[in-house]
């Protein structure tokens, strides 16, 4: 069944229907249980008979906003209903000052180690602890400025290519050396690369080298030229343009309040997705597509659609306002969105400041 656009859907609901719908969703977000007409009649601020409430619930069900998980059960919001609630009714306020202070203190304390890894790990830990979901942070290595590259000979025909980022990260790859290359040629190749890649991102550095004139290339002998080509090409293989790091904390939180076999199966799918990290670059694309916090519910979240999870995610940026990663919270569809949205937003702001 095709549902009408959100503004038409909202205008089609009278105040009584809106109140009942909001109460059904809020009850679900609080405890995950279906709510029936008798309980609703006690919870509503104005008096309505259970029969009247059942008629309203029937209309809401016809619109695809709620459903009955069992014949004799109360009602739960559908995925469409949750999306409608988030878009039309969710009231997001500011984080309490004490939570803002706690987030900033913990993430900044990790920043004193001058390790990007520490900052990102602490951010995911903070989000996990405050949300009772799983906190995740994703960063894309191709958007990090390079500091230098060097080659360390391991064997006559093999060397370790060491790529150092300006944020302190270090990545290593083992490469095959051109036959007959000398130690002085290794040094010459690394010096040449460093003269042209410093301060550039990996993708920019590759582009810069492609633009070099033939005359500039002739500064190197043939073997050194081969090594220069291999030096950055080693980061061009499968997965090189994928996010370099996915940090997840708080998986155990997702096991709380799991009752049904269906819930366990959904969690299995989610854990598998988090473990394989397949398609994680899409998460950066999703975050970058919006200007702030984005909410993906159930199948809207293509990465974790089989798990029936919700994802609240925001980008964090470098000093030039380029998106260099994303952070957020993943959990059941009954996340406390009103609390988690400002939490994710503020954490992204703090991480952005620390990484500039």
Curated annotation (Swiss-Prot):
Record carries keyword Protein biosynthesis: no
Gene Ontology BP, a term: negative regulation of DNA-templated transcription
Family annotation (Pfam families): HrcA
GO molecular function: DNA binding
Keyword Transcription regulation: yes
Keywords: Repressor, Stress response, Transcription, Transcription regulation
Its job: Negative regulator of class I heat shock genes (grpE-dnaK-dnaJ and groELS operons). Prevents heat-shock induction of these operons.
Family: Belongs to the HrcA family.
Name used for this protein in its record: Heat-inducible transcription repressor HrcA
């Amino acid at each position: 069944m095709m549902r009408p656009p959100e503004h038409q859907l909202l205008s089609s609901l009278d105040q009584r229907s809106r109140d009942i719908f909001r109460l059904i969703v809020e009850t679900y977000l609080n405890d995950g249980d279906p709510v029936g007409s008798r309980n609703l009649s006690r919870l509503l601020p104005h008096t309505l008979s259970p029969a009247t409430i059942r008629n309203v619930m029937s209309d809401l069900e016809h619109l695809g906003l709620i459903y009955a998980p069992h014949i004799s059960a109360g009602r739960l919001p559908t995925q469409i209903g949750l999306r409608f609630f988030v878009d039309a009714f969710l009231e997001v306020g500011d984080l309490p000052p004490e939570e803002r202070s706690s987030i900033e203190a913990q993430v900044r304390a990790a920043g004193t180690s001058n390790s990007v890894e520490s900052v990102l790990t602490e951010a995911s830990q903070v989000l996990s602890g405050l949300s009772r979901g799983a906190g995740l942070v994703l960063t894309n290595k191709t958007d990090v400025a390079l500091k230098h590259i060097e080659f360390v000979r391991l064997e006559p025909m093999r060397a370790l290519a060491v790529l150092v980022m300006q944020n302190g990260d270090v990545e290593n790859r083992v490469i095959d050396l051109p036959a007959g290359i000398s130690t002085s040629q290794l040094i010459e190749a690394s010096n040449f690369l460093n003269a042209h890649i410093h301060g550039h991102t990996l993708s920019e550095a590759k582009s810069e080298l492609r633009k070099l004139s033939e005359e500039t290339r002739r500064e190197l002998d043939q073997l050194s030229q081969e090594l220069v080509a291999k030096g950055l090409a080693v980061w061009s293989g499968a997965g090189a343009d994928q996010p370099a790091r996915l940090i997840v904390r708080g998986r155990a939180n997702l096991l709380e309040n799991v009752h049904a076999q269906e819930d366990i199966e959904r969690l299995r799918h989610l854990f598998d997705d988090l473990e394989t990290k397949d398609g994680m670059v899409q998460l950066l694309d999703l975050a970058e597509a919006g200007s702030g916090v984005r909410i993906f519910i159930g199948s809207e979240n293509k990465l974790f659609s089989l798990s029936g999870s919700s994802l609240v995610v925001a980008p964090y940026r470098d000093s030039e306002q380029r998106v260099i990663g994303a952070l957020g919270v993943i959990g059941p569809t009954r996340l406390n969105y009103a609390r988690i949205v400002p939490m994710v937003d503020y954490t992204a702001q703090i991480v952005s400041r620390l990484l500039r």
